[in-house]
């Protein structure tokens, strides 16, 4: 089997396996800004080539506190920039903790997630995926409660039909005493088309419609469009976003605008070519509600 070149790895056309169902809309979503409020200081420190820790201090009206995070990446190299196992975790001073474990054995990839809030298990989720030559089959179990007989099961299937077209389906099954009738299931269908400079993806189900479009204008400029329609509440929102980079200046800008008249953006500027200091400015404004939020952050490492 020939080793893929760097250009092939960087190509927007996926390799033989179509990837995970959860990643159908990821390319477009990566363009959107992740806005924050207040002041934030983040320090990332690599202790070795496999282990990294982070310290985050946040000051805002909604969230003030300190969080410690750690990341471990194993030595099982399965791709040019992919190694397993991966362990992620972070916690605050009150003991509220989230943790994730990812591992891959052959064509099987597993993911375990857990969350503890106020000393109690707030959520748990386990996922296993089988990645074949032309398809990915996934099964997720979430918040399974054997005592109260409640939980969520999700089955996903994504298939490569042509080098550019992927189709898939998802079945979500939830059961429990709080569910009308004791159980409910939702079936969704999905498709993704990948061209040289754009990716279009769609998810259609009884609960609504989700459409995304990603366009790579050039090496440093990309656009994203997202349409979400929730049939249960009768709401629909369209969002336009862009991402631009100036590598020579160390500048990255992401901004978005939606049909709820909300504008948001995050500006990042590398302060030094020799030192790993990055300044981040964030802002959101809703013109209808006349409400705005502003954030400033410093990232070290």
UniProtKB/Swiss-Prot annotation:
<keyword id="KW-1000">Mitochondrion outer membrane</keyword>
<keyword id="KW-0406">Ion transport</keyword>
<feature type="region of interest" description="Disordered">
    <location>
        <begin position="1"/>
        <end position="20"/>
    </location>
</feature>
<comment type="function">
    <text>Channel-forming protein essential for import of protein precursors into mitochondria. Specifically required for nnt-1 accumulation in the mitochondria and may be involved in the secretion of daf-28/insulin from the mitochondria. Required for embryonic and larval development.</text>
</comment>
<dbReference type="GO" id="GO:0005742">
    <property type="term" value="C:mitochondrial outer membrane translocase complex"/>
</dbReference>
<dbReference type="GO" id="GO:0008320">
    <property type="term" value="F:protein transmembrane transporter activity"/>
</dbReference>
<keyword id="KW-0653">Protein transport</keyword>
<keyword id="KW-0626">Porin</keyword>
<dbReference type="GO" id="GO:0031966">
    <property type="term" value="C:mitochondrial membrane"/>
</dbReference>
<keyword id="KW-0472">Membrane</keyword>
<dbReference type="GO" id="GO:0030150">
    <property type="term" value="P:protein import into mitochondrial matrix"/>
</dbReference>
<dbReference type="GO" id="GO:0006811">
    <property type="term" value="P:monoatomic ion transport"/>
</dbReference>
<dbReference type="GO" id="GO:0015288">
    <property type="term" value="F:porin activity"/>
</dbReference>
<dbReference type="InterPro" id="IPR023614">
    <property type="entry name" value="Porin_dom_sf"/>
</dbReference>
<dbReference type="Pfam" id="PF01459">
    <property type="entry name" value="Porin_3"/>
</dbReference>
<dbReference type="GO" id="GO:0046930">
    <property type="term" value="C:pore complex"/>
</dbReference>
<keyword id="KW-1134">Transmembrane beta strand</keyword>
<dbReference type="InterPro" id="IPR037930">
    <property type="entry name" value="Tom40"/>
</dbReference>
<keyword id="KW-0496">Mitochondrion</keyword>
<dbReference type="InterPro" id="IPR027246">
    <property type="entry name" value="Porin_Euk/Tom40"/>
</dbReference>
<dbReference type="GO" id="GO:0006626">
    <property type="term" value="P:protein targeting to mitochondrion"/>
</dbReference>
<keyword id="KW-0813">Transport</keyword>
<keyword id="KW-0812">Transmembrane</keyword>
<comment type="subunit">
    <text>Forms part of the preprotein translocase complex of the outer mitochondrial membrane (TOM complex). Interacts with mitochondrial targeting sequences.</text>
</comment>
<feature type="compositionally biased region" description="Polar residues">
    <location>
        <begin position="1"/>
        <end position="19"/>
    </location>
</feature>
<protein>
    <recommendedName>
        <fullName>Mitochondrial import receptor subunit TOM40 homolog</fullName>
    </recommendedName>
</protein>
<comment type="similarity">
    <text>Belongs to the Tom40 family.</text>
</comment>
